[in-house]
A protein has these predicted regions:
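Structured interaction patches on ligand/partner-binding surfaces of diverse proteins
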Residues: 98-131
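Beta-strand-rich modules
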Residues: 217-241
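Short, ordered, surface-exposed loop/turn motifs in non-cytosolic proteins
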Residues: 42-66, 170-173
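Short, acidic Ser/Thr/Gly-rich low-complexity loop/linker segments typical of extracellular
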Residues: 62-80
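Short amphipathic, basic-aromatic surface patches that mediate peripheral association
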Residues: 37-46, 159-168
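Short Pro-Gly-centered beta-turn/loop motif in secreted/extracellular proteins
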Residues: 82-99
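Short beta-strand elements
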Residues: 111-119, 240-254
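Bacterial Sec-dependent N-terminal signal peptides
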Residues: 1-44, 254
Length: 254
């Protein structure tokens, strides 16, 4: 009897080991989804920040479920995205960020507008390219180049305009920030607090600056003697309160 139990236990262990081996040998995902989030009005990519508060790509695998759990991956700062570890399957794909949502619903949850894209990925090592045209809440454009002042602070000029005429996304501007960093990856999650100039607005105070040339100067005295990057971020009280951004610019210490 003991021998039989021994052989039975040994057999179960062998089966389990075999099953684990098969699972371990399952091929890793090797397909790529790449592309851009593009401003429908200008054709430029929509600037964002790196990390969880930036633009993200949303995938719904619809191959086996009508109500799948979303899978997200983050966009890069310049508005492009790339994920090289995607399984072969059928997906519904959209992007989420500081722009009019591609998928909109009414108060009952009924979809009223859907600009997401459906794709089918087959095989391995394939590349699927997707571009999404969106209407950013705000556009931020530099006016001229940053200027070094006599006291080694820097003054910049820029304009903020609306990126959409959608009546649901005309909220007041709540924040306008001049970010300073020693890398080009500056934003609300990566800046030097000694020199960054951050302004919060109440009511229509920030909104009244839309369309005007805005001037801001770094804080904290003389900048360090090194290459410095500047970037403007602004946001309205909508969506996930994410920032719209200018492109980063650098200036060499004189």
């Amino acid at each position: 009897m003991k021998k039989r139990l021994y052989y039975l236990a040994f057999g179960l262990v062998a089966i389990a080991a075999s099953s684990c081996s098969k699972l371990d040998n399952y091929p890793a995902p090797s397909n790529t989804i790449t592309g851009s989030t593009v401003d429908a009005g200008t054709g430029n990519t929509v600037q964002t920040e790196i990390g969880s508060r930036g633009t993200r790509v949303k995938l719904l695998e619809t191959s086996y479920s009508s109500n799948p759990t979303p899978y997200y991956f983050q966009s890069m700062q310049d508005g492009t995205f790339n994920d090289t570890k995607i399984f072969a399957a059928t997906y519904n794909v959209s992007v989420e960020g500081p722009f009019v949502p591609l998928v909109q619903t009414d108060s009952t949850g009924k979809v009223t507008s859907d600009q997401s894209q459906n794709i089918t990925i087959k095989g391995t090592n394939t590349v699927t390219k997707l571009n999404f045209k969106v209407e950013p809440f705000l556009r931020i454009d530099w006016v001229g180049q940053p200027v070094f002042n006599a006291d080694s602070t820097v003054t910049v000029q820029f304009k903020i305009t609306r990126g959409t005429t959608n009546a649901n996304y005309q909220q007041d501007v709540t924040n306008i920030n001049l970010y300073v960093s020693n890398t080009k990856y500056d934003g609300d999650n990566n800046y030097d607090p000694r020199y960054t100039n951050m302004i919060s607005y109440n009511g229509t105070d920030g909104t009244s600056l839309i369309g005007q040339t805005i001037t801001m100067t770094t804080t904290g005295g003389a900048l360090p003697q090194q290459d410095v990057y500047f970037r403007i971020g602004a946001r309205i009280n909508a969506g996930l309160d994410e920032y719209n951004y200018s492109t980063p610019v650098s200036v060499k210490y004189p």
